[in-house]
Amino acid sequence: MNDIAAISFSGQMMGCICVDKEGRALRNALIWADMRATKEEEMIRERISEEDFYHLTGHKISPSYGGQKLMWVKNNEPEIYENTYKMLNCKDYIILKLTGEFVTEYTDASSTNLLDLNKLEWSDRLLEVMGIDREKMPALLKSTDVAGTVTDEAAKACGLVSGIPVVCGGGDGVCAAVGTGCTKEGIAHSCMGTSSWISITTEKPIYDEEMRTFTWAHIVPGYVLPTGTMQCGGGSYSWFTKELCKYESLLGEQQGVSKYDLLEQEIGDSKPGANGLLFLPYLIGERSPRWNPKAKGAFIGLKMETEKKDMVRAVQEGVAFNLGVVMDVFKGKGVAIDDMIVIGGGAQSDAWLQILADVYNINIQKPNYLEEATSMGAAITAGVGVGVFENFDVIDKFLKIEETKTPNTDNQPVYSAMKPIFDEAYFALTGVFDKLSEFTK
């Protein structure tokens, strides 16, 4: 334990943990996927224009964000709100337990919708709009700042040595950017995890007129991280394989192979376009690019000839089409993306990587680690914070590209034709989604 130079964290973003002065959690955490604050979203829109809000925060008004969640707590659990000393995100809560310090840093702060992205400070205007007391917000630090040191009590509980520096770290999406080498202008990455996103490092925020994308603060000083995150990317595939692929699970157990290996074969047996089948991947509502908490998932184009192989492929294509909207936003702003590193569990699917290359019409790169990019980003942030590493360029020593998928020109006409149909299908069903939501309250 004496060899530990620093401790740091990557954690899920857009959450809300209410703690009292003793650091005790007052209720269960509200996580990024919690969309209950829809009434608060409407209240905010009555108090500030969507455009002003977007340019202040880099984000849309949405129940996904931590500030709206705390607003919900105030409106629905006033006693908990009154007893809340600070609102924290999950990694900040662990930092509190290790150091006794109530802090956050710019990346997680930018997931609250209470941070002025340009000034990197809590916005008095937004706090007033949401009716949140400024003193309930934690101290703001840089990602590379030392929040404190491991206390004697924490050291005893965790088997650590007291006095180890604890560096703030960052939100998972931003740590992933560092872990995939997106530490300089114009480098892009995508994560195919439960939620899935595309991010690119730039010096200035990218503001989309339709507000389909948003911008995080970056761990690396002088940069920001324009991003589009869908709620249920890899999660859509996980849902499908769990609920509709029980045969493959049993067969895989008998043959000693993964069900995902069997499904890879099925995807390969279905042609691009999935035999005219579309999948809308909105199983838990949607953030970017739709920003519709009432959106639902759907298969469109089912017919007697449809086979499971088509359905599996349609799920992967649907996620790619949805993230493709984010790509189109960035390209429409003049951002050139020729290569993209893809991480997350979904990146283990060679078929999916090829679909991404074909839909985006860029090279898709698979690195030497898929699940550890966020941890790598946090570790490098810690090293820079305590001087073990001179700067973030050290990622080049760890990150290696193992495989590259190039676009298949034979498949692109199909995807170019289907992408607008995918968009048309979503917009045609928005009214249906609204009506169905009445049955799921």
Descriptions of predicted regions:
Residues 1-67:
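Active-site phosphate-binding/coordination module
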Residues 12, 145, 345:
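Flexible loop residues that form catalytic
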Residues 34, 148-152:
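Short, glycine/charge-rich flexible loops or terminal/linker lids adjacent to PRPP-binding catalytic cores
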Residues 138-146, 254-259:
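Short linear loop/turn motifs
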